[in-house]
Amino acid sequence: SGSDWTEIYVMDTATRELLPDHIEWAKFTGASWLGDGFYYSAYPAPEAGKEFSNANEGHNVYYHRLGTPQCDDTIAFEDPANPLHFHQAGVSDDQSALILGIGGQGIGDAVMIKDMRRPGSKWVTIEPSQEYYNDVVDVIGGNAYMLTSVGAPRNRFVKINLAQPARDKWVEIIPEDADGGVLTSVQFAGKDRLIAVFDRDASNHAYVYDLDGKLIREIEFPTYGTASFSSSR
C-alpha cells in the first residue's frame, strides 16, 4: 500500500522542459489525452504519515486541464458504493468516447462507455460483470469493438452498438478459435482491416480480416514464436 504510487509530469516535447503540471497520488493508471488535458486515475491524498499504510479506497477517474493545479481537476467517474474497485479510463482514437474499465472484484473487467461528443451524456454499460476478460479496442461510429471472453472462454471479437448494448445484440466478427487457440489481440490496420493474433500450439498465428470478419489471409512467419503488431486506423 503505497510502494507503487505514481506521479505524472508533463513535458514540452519541443523544448524538453517540464511544465508546471504535476499529478500526485495516482496509481494503476496512465494518462489518456483529450483536448487540452488528460484523464488519469488516483486515490484521495492520504493523511500525512499514512502514505504507505492507508487502505487503497476510492480509486476515481479525474480530468486534468493543462496549466491548472491538481486541486482543480474534475471527477469524471467515482463509485463510493464500491470503494475497493479499480477504475481505468481511455479515450477512443477519434476522441469521441471515454472507455472505462472497472476491476477489483473478479478475474476481469466490467466496461462502461461515455459519448464525449454530447455534453452531459450518461455512461452506457457495455458489460456489467467483472468475471470476464473484456478489452475495448476502439469505438467507431457509435459501435464499440471489443475482445471478450463472454460466451467464449478463449475469447472472441465483437461489435456492440452503444444504443443497444445488451449481449444478445452483440455482433460477432471473429469467433472463438475452432482449433483450440486463444485469441490474444485484435488491432485495426487502416480503415478496413483487422489483424488478429491467436496463441495456438505454443506459438502465435496472425491473420488479416475485413471489418465483417471475413478472413483475407494469414501472415506467414518464418518459424515458431511470439508476434506483436503496431497499427492503427
Predicted regions and their residues:
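Peripheral, non-catalytic segments that deliver or gate enzyme domains
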Residues: 1-233
